[in-house]
Amino acid sequence: MATYPCQLCGKTFLTLEKFTIHNYSHSRERPYKCLQPDCGKAFISRYKLMRHMATHSPQKSHQCAHCEKTFNRKDHLKNHLQTHDPNKMAFGCEECGKKYNTMLGYKRHLALHAASSGDLTCGVCALELGSTEVLLDHLKAHAEEKPPSGTKEKKHQCDHCERCFYTRKDVRRHLVVHTGCKDFLCQFCAQRFGRKDHLTRHTKKTHSQELMKESLQSGDLLSTFHSISPQFQLKAAPLSPFPLGAPAQNGLASSLPAEVHSHTHNPSEQTSQPVQALPELLAPLHPVAPPTSPPQPLQNHKYNTSSTSYSPLASLPLKADTKGFCNTNLLEDLPLQEPQSPHKLNPGFDLAKGGAGKVNLPKELPADAVNLTIPASLDLSPLLGFWQLPPPATQNAFGNSTLTLGPGESLPHRLSCLGQQQQDPSLAMSTMSLGQLPLPPIPHVFPAGTGSAILPHFHHAFR
């Protein structure tokens, strides 16, 4: 920024207009003259000329509130009000006894006494002048200038204490300390304050979280969120569901945890909890190696498996409340018919009812399991249409493709109902072992976060 320094006194000005007006004080040039015939005053700026013209107006609109005096100009009234202030700070001259309210007026008065005694140095700016007339004109220029902000004084004193302030407004604002009036109530607590700025400071310091909540609810910070740089905003792309039994082909598999990665490659261990979508931006940053072995089931048994009374249940799987993608627990949720003989199955394929209305498919059964035969009229296509059947030679989730039932075990009610229907003649067979029937992978999942696993009912093993 360009500045304009004065070569005579060293003052610096920011604008050319102020620099030109200042030069008039050194050259004693007054280009703006009063047009009144009886007044020959001239001024260095148009503003000061217009302010002077108000003195020639017969209307005096500025009246003192303490006396009946009126003034043409507001600054004259302001100077007059200083005479009614009992706490004003007065600077008295020792030679003539005059008193001044400001330090600048007092120094200007002392410069006049110094000029009359032969000292031609300005008492305001310490400038040496050539003659007394030049010094007096120079002092008049200081009289027309406004006092700098550094010389502003606290000339307004409180009536109840010794504190002084710059303006009357500051004194009135200070009076709440003595009156005890607290009209500003905090909206978050019951605390009151005498000044508004004290309430604002208390709210920002103590209730910053409440203010943040109100800003979020009103939507004031929405523009702040959108103004964040794009590289700091994580964008999560929606993920398409993985096909059942097929490995993931994108780069997201490396960023998934070990448990999720193993469930993605092993459909027999799918859990009911959906995999949350991770940001694509974080995929290459956290590679996770695939597990070398499948997760081991929980071993926190409630009962001792080596006990004599518990030994028939040692090979049975623990019951898990699982809801898969293909409703693999359909066999457990179906109601059962009334039981008949557990060792005899009629051609109508009526099965015995088990326990509390649910059939638990065992993982391993004893060696004396009974193979069941299926009549040629049985059509299993409505049931098997729910799943994508693997090839007959593949292994299912239980390690064997045959489903065998021990003595007393029963098949679901859905199979007994489907035995009365026949829709596709290609599935008809004379006699068929149910163990040769390929079954879909049935998940074997243990819910995480529980201290003890849910055990099967005891009467499943003793029927």
Curated annotation (Swiss-Prot):
Instruction: Give residue spans, biased composition: Polar residues.
Output: 298-310
The record's annotation in Pfam families points to:
zf-C2H2
Query: For this protein, what is any one GO molecular function term?
Result: RNA polymerase II cis-regulatory region sequence-specific DNA binding
Give the main location: nucleus
User: Keywords of this protein's UniProt record, alphabetized?
Assistant: Activator, DNA-binding, Metal-binding, Nucleus, Repeat, Transcription, Transcription regulation, Zinc, Zinc-finger
Its Gene Ontology cellular component terms are: Golgi apparatus; nuclear body; nucleoplasm
What the entry lists under SMART domains is as follows:
ZnF_C2H2 (SM00355)
Where in or outside the cell it occurs: the entry states: Nucleus
Q: Which GO terms describe its biological process?
A: negative regulation of transcription by RNA polymerase II; regulation of cytokine production; regulation of immune system process
Classification via SUPFAM superfamilies: beta-beta-alpha zinc fingers (SSF57667)
What ranges does the record give for the region Disordered, renumbered to this chain? 285-310
Residue ranges covered by zinc fingers (C2H2-type): 4-26, 32-56, 62-84, 91-113, 120-142, 156-178, 184-207
Bias category Pro residues: which stretches?
287-297
What do we know about how this protein assembles, alone or with others? Interacts with THRSP.
Role played = Acts as a transcriptional activator. Involved in the transcriptional regulation of type 1 receptor for pituitary adenylate cyclase-activating polypeptide.
Can you tell me which family this protein belongs to?
Answer: Belongs to the krueppel C2H2-type zinc-finger protein family.
The protein depicted here goes by the name Zinc finger protein PLAGL1
In its UniProt entry, the species of origin is given as Sus scrofa
